[in-house]
C-alpha cells in the first residue's frame, strides 16, 4: 500500500506513516525482549549485551531492507529521515537497557564502595577491604562489550549517512547530532564514568598485589612482580583503548603512569637500599652468594622494567593508531 502515496503526491505523509510503522515494530520487539530479560534478573548472569545487540540489529536491518522504499518516497532524504526517527527508538529503548544493566550490577553502589576504600587507605589504620577485583573484572568486560556495541552502531549509522550523495545539507548535522547528543549517548557517558572508576580500582589492586607477593622465580633473571605488574597494566590499557573513548584512555593511562612512577618505582628501589648491604658482601659468609644474587636480580628488575615501559608505550601507540 505504501507505493500508492507517490501517485497521490503525498510522499512525505507516506514516509512518516511507514517509518512510524517501523518504529512500532522495533519498539514492540525490543520491549518483549527487555521484559524477558527483566524476568531473569534474579539469575547471576543476565545477557544485556545480547538484548542491546538485537535492538541495534533491528534498527540497522529496518534501514537496510527498506532503503528502496524509503528512497522511492523521498529520495535519500527519506533514508536520513528514517535513520533519525529510528534513532529515537535507540535513545528510548537503548537507554532503558543500559540503565537496567547499571542497576543490575549496582554500579553506583560499587563505585561508592571503591571511593570509600580509597579514602580509607589514606586513613590511619586503614579500613574494610574493597570489592573483589575478580568480580570487578567481570563487570569491566561486560561494560566494555556494551560500550563497543554502542560505538560500533553509532559509527556505522553516521558513516551510512555520510555515504549518501544527494542529501539535503541541512539534514547531515541534524542526523549526526541525533547520535552524539541523544539520551542513549548520555547514558553511555554515565556508564563510561563507572568504567573509569572500576578499571582504576582493578589496576591499582592488582599491581599492589603483584608487588606484595613478589618472589624470586627459579631460572629467571627478575622477580615475579615485573612480569605480573606489566601484564596488569597491558591488560587494563588494552581494554581502555578498546572502548574507543578518549577520556577513558587518558584516565587509565594517567593511573598506569602514576603507579609506575610511585609504588612500582619504590618497590624496585627497595632491595637496593637494604641496610648494611656493602658490609654483608665485604665480610663474606654464608649469605654472600644469596645477597649477591638478590642485588643482581634487583638490578635486572630495573633493566627489564625499562624495556617493558618502552614496549608498553609502543603497543599503546600502535593500538591507538588502529
Write out the residue ranges for each language-model feature.
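Extended, noncatalytic alpha-helical scaffold/tether regions
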Residues: 1-191, 195-217
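Extended alpha-helical rod/solenoid/coiled-coil scaffold segments used as assembly/tethering elements
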Residues: 46, 141, 145-158, 162-177, ...
Amino acid at each position: 500500500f505504501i507505493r500508492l502515496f507517490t501517485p497521490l503526491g503525498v510522499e512525505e505523509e507516506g514516509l512518516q506513516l511507514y517509518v512510524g510503522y517501523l518504529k512500532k515494530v522495533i519498539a514492540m520487539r525490543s520491549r518483549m525482549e527487555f521484559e524477558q530479560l527483566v524476568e531473569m534478573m534474579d539469575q547471576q548472569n543476565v545477557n544485556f549485551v545480547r538484548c542491546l545487540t538485537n535492538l541495534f540489529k533491528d534498527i540497522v536491518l529496518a534501514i537496510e531492507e527498506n532503503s528502496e522504499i524509503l528512497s522511492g518516497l523521498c529520495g535519500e532524504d527519506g533514508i536520513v529521515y528514517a535513520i533519525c526517527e529510528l534513532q529515537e527508538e535507540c535513545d528510548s529503548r537503548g537507554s532503558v537497557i543500559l540503565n537496567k544493566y547499571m542497576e543490575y550490577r549496582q554500579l553506583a553502589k560499587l563505585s561508592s564502595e571503591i571511593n570509600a576504600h580509597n579514602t580509607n587507605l589514606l586513613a590511619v589504620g586503614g579500613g574494610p577491604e574493597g570489592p573483589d577485583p575478580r568480580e570487578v573484572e567481570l563487570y569491566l568486560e561486560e561494560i566494555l562489550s556494551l560500550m563497543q556495541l554502542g560505538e560500533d552502531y553509532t559509527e556505522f549509522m553516521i558513516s551510512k549517512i555520510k555515504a549518501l550523495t544527494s542529501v539535503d545539507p541541512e539534514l547531515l548535522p541534524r542526523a549526526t547530532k541525533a547520535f552524539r547528543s541523544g539520551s542513549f549517548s548520555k547514558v553511555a557517558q554515565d556508564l563510561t564514568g563507572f568504567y573509569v572508576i572500576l578499571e582504576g580500582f582493578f589496576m591499582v589492586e592488582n599491581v599492589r598485589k603483584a608487588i606484595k607477593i613478589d618472589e624470586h622465580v627459579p631460572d629467571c633473571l627478575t622477580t615475579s612482580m615485573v612480569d605480573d605488574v606489566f601484564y596488569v597494566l597491558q591488560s587494563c590499557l588494552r581494554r581502555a583503548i578498546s572502548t574507543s573513548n578518549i577520556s577513558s584512555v587518558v584516565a587509565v593511562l594517567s593511573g598506569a603512569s602514576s603507579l609506575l612512577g610511585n609504588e612500582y618505582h619504590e618497590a624496585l628501589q627497595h632491595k637496593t637500599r637494604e641496610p648494611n648491604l656493602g658490609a654483608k658482601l665485604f665480610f663474606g659468609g654464608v649469605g654472600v652468594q644469596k645477597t649477591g644474587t638478590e642485588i643482581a636480580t634487583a638490578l635486572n628488575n630495573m633493566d627489564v622494567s625499562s624495556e617493558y615501559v618502552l614496549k608498553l608505550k609502543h603497543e599503546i601507540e600502535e593500538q591507538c593508531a588502529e
